[in-house]
């Protein structure tokens, strides 16, 4: 696997020197300063590449070229945004970049309710609390029809949770959910958020699939023509939220995506933390089934809680993800490719490290502090080395 590191650009508190010292050789980044829907010019791409090259690093994966909301709803200037997306892909390929991660989550990117969940050892993790989220939906956002998505017991618990909240806690929970986490390109006020949700009235899972199918039928031929691998990121969490459909959550969704445009360039990001939140997602079986389509991996572990819809980020080698089995499955696919003549390594990045040690005293991007990811990368690197020595001695 190619060891990579997500970097949010020049304003990231983690420097490129830090990235090199962590042992990563590739960087996963994006041009966050370019508005959604606009073309990424060759000049801007080359500028970012040069910045990385100065530190001896390569731009291994784009994460992400954002998919404009109008593409997802098929409204407004959606076709122009698709045309711009295609041009961005061509420009990236012309600059030698061959892997692009993207997602098709409506309105929100990845979602958490607590960005400072304290673990027993004093480190901090990200958490999604189903009851806190219900309290937000039912009593802060007051989304029409939200009660239908929660059991009577969850509604009772959510009311108690909300009643115990002070004004500052309401503000913090709201910001955690709608203000935009790292990598999300848009944040909202409550009124803006309600308006954005309303744009999806009448859009169910089947309709969103139709919209994604149109998008893929437009962009995959372009990616194929210029040798650029697309890797869709799963929904996080992997289920419908806020009354919105989600269509990249299960093995059935992956099969649909594979078939809708049957090209190896129409591929997946295997995010073990996102898919792994669902107990019915067999990660190893998914890797084995869709191995030739897996172009990028996010390796992390989550811990499901008493309410199975609640979870927090675990240590990389703990939690509900069998990291040994996952890494072995990825290396099996990598070995298969090498035997077929494809010597490219599958890019991997350690995802969502705990905030720990000296980073507890620093301003960090939630989930993306340096030391927690350094620890995760070192642990996964060790697992990879051991598996290679025992099972794949021919691999470098």
Curated annotation (Swiss-Prot):
Pathway in which the depicted protein is active: Carbohydrate metabolism; pentose and glucuronate interconversion
One Pfam family it belongs to: UxuA
Enzyme class: lyase
Entry's family note: Belongs to the mannonate dehydratase family.
Known function: Catalyzes the dehydration of D-mannonate.
Gene Ontology BP, a term: D-glucuronate catabolic process
Domain of life: Bacteria
Keyword match Iron: yes
GO molecular function per UniProt: ferrous iron binding; manganese ion binding; mannonate dehydratase activity
Catalyzed reaction equations: D-mannonate = 2-dehydro-3-deoxy-D-gluconate + H2O
Keyword set, alphabetical order: Iron, Lyase, Manganese
Keyword Cytoplasm: no
Membrane-crossing segments per the record: none
Name the record gives this protein: Mannonate dehydratase
HAMAP family named in the record: UxuA
The EC number(s) this enzyme carries: 4.2.1.8
Signal peptide span: none
Cofactor(s) needed by this chain: Fe(2+); Mn(2+)
Cysteines joined through disulfide linkages: none
């Amino acid at each position: 696997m190619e060891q990579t590191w997500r970097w949010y650009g020049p304003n990231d508190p983690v420097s490129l020197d830090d990235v090199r010292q962590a042992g990563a050789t590739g960087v996963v980044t994006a041009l966050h300063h370019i508005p959604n829907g606009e073309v990424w010019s060759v000049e801007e791409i080359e500028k970012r590449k040069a910045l990385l090259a100065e530190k001896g690093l390569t731009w291994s994966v784009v994460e992400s070229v954002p998919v404009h909301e109008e593409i997802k709803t098929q409204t407004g200037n959606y076709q122009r945004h698709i045309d711009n997306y295609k041009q961005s892909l061509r420009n990236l390929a012309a600059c030698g970049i061959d892997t692009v991660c993207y997602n098709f989550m409506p309105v929100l990117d990845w979602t958490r309710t607590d960005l400072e969940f304290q673990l027993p050892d004093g480190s901090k993790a990200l958490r999604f609390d189903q009851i806190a989220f219900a309290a937000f939906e039912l009593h802060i956002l007051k989304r029409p029809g939200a009660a239908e998505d929660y059991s009577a017991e969850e509604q009772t618990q959510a009311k108690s949770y909300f009643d115990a909240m002070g004004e500052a806690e309401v503000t913090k929970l709201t910001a955690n959910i709608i203000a935009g986490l790292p990598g999300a390109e848009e944040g909202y006020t409550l009124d803006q958020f309600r308006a954005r949700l309303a744009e999806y009235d009448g859009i169910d899972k089947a309709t969103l699939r139709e919209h994604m199918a149109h998008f893929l039928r437009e962009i995959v031929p372009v990616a194929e023509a210029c040798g650029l691998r697309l890797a869709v990121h799963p929904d996080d969490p992997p289920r419908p939220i806020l009354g919105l459909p989600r269509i990249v959550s299960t093995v059935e969704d992956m099969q649909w995506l594979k078939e809708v445009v049957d090209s190896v360039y129409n591929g997946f990001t295997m995010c073990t933390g996102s898919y792994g939140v669902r107990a019915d997602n067999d990660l190893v079986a998914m890797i084995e089934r869709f191995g030739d389509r897996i172009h990028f991996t996010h390796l992390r572990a989550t811990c499901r809680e008493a309410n199975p819809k609640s979870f927090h980020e675990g240590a990389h080698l703990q939690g509900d993800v069998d990291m040994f089995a996952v890494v072995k499955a990825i290396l099996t696919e990598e070995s298969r490719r090498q035997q077929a003549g494809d010597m490219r390594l599958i890019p991997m990045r350690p995802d969502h490290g705990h905030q720990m040690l000296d980073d507890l005293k620093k301003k960090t991007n939630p989930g993306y502090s340096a030391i927690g990811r350094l620890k995760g990368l070192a642990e996964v690197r060790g697992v990879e080395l051991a598996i290679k020595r025992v099972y794949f001695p021919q691999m470098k």
